[in-house]
């Protein structure tokens, strides 16, 4: 009888093509997602070597990072570097026979939202993309992670990847989530607990009642930020919630094939007694709405708390780092989080740009107005999310409240397009990173849930969403 295996063990074992004595493995890759920033050199490498894309039907190209989200983007991309990258992806996809969603295609959007929408992402698969937030797809019980540009070329050419296996880590979130606390708060709390290096060398499996209670969109938010906790990837075992989400998707199995697939997917869970190298447990019932205060995703505190004092940190290097973060953020120890005013609000990204995120934000702002000191924007994660939101009338709620309603794309998550902060501007953001300059030169980012961001837009400062009226 074989030893109990984790979910990660099972997917890994199913995809090993060859293993060397030092543990280095050649893994088969089931799905490859491509965007315009990390792929040009990879395609050029194929072109110079005279190689085709080995499995174009297992590859999907989407433009997302550089595309403008302004309504007039149909007139073309003004930034020359961005335009060159977008044009290169369109040309490369055509030359190599890869399916491509341009900015004019309603299926276009952030690659990690598009994959699941299309049924391209399925349980038990290995999925890669030249983007760190590929971990998002782990919400389906798929082994998904980012790769570098040279690896993008290797996968395009061979449909395989050279890897060494990571260790297993289990994060259990037990109990029921309180009202006002979301998947975003869970994952920020996890990162606050383990730190940004806590998952280094591991693949994290998320489990527990609170995780099981989440929708697929909430689970994608959790797995999306696994990389911010240092992990190679994040996984959630598939269940009926997963199967229902997949049914009817354009590229998902249908009919009898789907039933056969579901029978297999039901085996994708960690066995009783499977070994985890590290286990972390959180109590969902004690979690509050969370706001980041510094320049690292581990710098988090309850919305009812205060900016911490770095002098309380024993480690000298870490203490100096946190003082630097406070200086960059323009904050002082002891400042109440609810006293921090914001200049900008960004609701979107591959972390929180899905329809449920927009519904949560709309519920908060309906019948209210954005504070006169705040510039707020809503960026749907894909054209299909935008279409659904407009069918539900959410765009009218946002526009009437004073939000800017945009076209889909990565937008202000990162300063690679026209949406960015000005120096010194402070933003309540539903994205995943609050590094120095992430949203623009000297911009200050606070990571929050969609409901918290929406409330900050109305109030002009952070508020406890649990007391929102």
UniProtKB/Swiss-Prot annotation:
GO terms for molecular function: 3-isopropylmalate dehydratase activity; 4 iron, 4 sulfur cluster binding; metal ion binding. It comes from the Bacteria. SUPFAM superfamilies: Aconitase iron-sulfur domain (SSF53732). InterPro entries: 3-IsopropMal_deHydase_lsu, Acnase/IPM_dHydase_lsu_aba_1/3, Acoase/IPM_deHydtase_lsu_aba, Aconitase_4Fe-4S_BS, Aconitase_4Fe-4S_dom, IPM_dehydratase_rel_enz, IPMI_cat. Its EC number is 4.2.1.33. Binds 1 [4Fe-4S] cluster per subunit. The keyword Lipid metabolism does not apply. Its cofactor is [4Fe-4S] cluster. GO terms for biological process: L-leucine biosynthetic process. The keyword Amino-acid biosynthesis applies. Keywords: 4Fe-4S, Amino-acid biosynthesis, Branched-chain amino acid biosynthesis, Iron, Iron-sulfur, Leucine biosynthesis, Lyase, Metal-binding. It holds the Pfam family Aconitase. Heterodimer of LeuC and LeuD. Belongs to the aconitase/IPM isomerase family. LeuC type 1 subfamily. HAMAP family: LeuC_type1. Catalyzes the isomerization between 2-isopropylmalate and 3-isopropylmalate, via the formation of 2-isopropylmaleate. NCBIfam families: leuC, PRK05478.1, PRK12466.1. This is 3-isopropylmalate dehydratase large subunit. It comes from Brucella canis (strain ATCC 23365 / NCTC 10854 / RM-666).
């Amino acid at each position: 009888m074989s030893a109990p295996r984790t979910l990660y063990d099972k997917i890994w074992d199913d995809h090993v093509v060859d293993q060397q004595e030092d543990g280095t493995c050649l893994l088969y890759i089931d799905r490859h997602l491509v965007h315009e920033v990390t792929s040009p050199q990879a395609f050029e490498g194929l072109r110079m070597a005279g190689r085709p894309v080995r499995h174009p039907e297992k590859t999907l190209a989407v433009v997302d990072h550089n595309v403008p989200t302004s309504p007039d983007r149909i007139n073309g991309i003004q930034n020359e570097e961005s335009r060159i990258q977008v044009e290169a992806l369109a040309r490369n996809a055509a030359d190599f026979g890869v399916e491509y969603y341009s900015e004019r295609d309603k299926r276009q959007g952030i690659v990690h939202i598009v994959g699941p929408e299309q049924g391209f992402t399925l349980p038990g698969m290995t999925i890669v993309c030249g983007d760190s937030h590929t971990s998002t797809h782990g919400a389906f019980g798929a082994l998904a992670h980012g790769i570098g540009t040279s690896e993008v070329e290797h996968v395009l050419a061979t449909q395989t990847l050279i890897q060494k296996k990571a260790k297993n880590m289990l994060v259990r979130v037990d109990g029921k989530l309180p009202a006002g606390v979301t998947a975003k708060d869970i994952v920020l709390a996890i990162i606050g607990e383990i730190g940004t290096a806590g998952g280094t060398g591991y693949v994290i499996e998320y489990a527990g009642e609170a995780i099981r209670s989440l929708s697929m969109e909430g689970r994608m938010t959790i797995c999306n930020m696994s990389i911010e906790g240092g992990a190679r990837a994040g996984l959630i075992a598939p269940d009926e919630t997963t199967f229902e989400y997949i049914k009817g998707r354009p590229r998902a199995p249908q009919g009898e094939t789907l039933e056969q697939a579901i029978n297999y997917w039901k085996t994708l869970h960690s066995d009783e007694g499977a070994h985890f190298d590290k286990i972390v447990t959180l109590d969902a019932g004690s979690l509050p709405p969370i706001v980041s205060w510094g320049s690292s995703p581990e710098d988090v505190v309850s919305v009812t708390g205060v900016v911490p004092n770095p002098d309380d940190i024993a480690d000298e290097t870490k203490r100096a780092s946190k003082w630097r973060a406070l200086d960059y953020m323009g904050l002082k120890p002891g400042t109440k989080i609810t006293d921090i005013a914001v200049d900008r609000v960004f609701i979107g990204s591959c972390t929180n740009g899905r329809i449920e995120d927009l519904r949560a934000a709309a519920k908060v702002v309906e019948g209210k107005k954005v504070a006169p000191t705040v510039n707020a924007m809503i960026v749907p994660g894909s054209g299909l999310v935008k279409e659904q939101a407009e069918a539900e009338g959410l765009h009218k709620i946002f526009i009437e409240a004073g939000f800017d309603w945009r076209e889909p794309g990565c937008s202000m998550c990162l300063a690679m397009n026209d949406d960015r902060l000005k120096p010194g501007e402070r933003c309540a953001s539903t994205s995943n990173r609050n590094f120095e300059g992430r949203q623009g030169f000297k911009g200050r980012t606070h990571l929050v849930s969609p409901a918290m961001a929406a409330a900050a837009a109305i109030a002009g400062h952070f508020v406890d969403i649990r007391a929102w009226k």
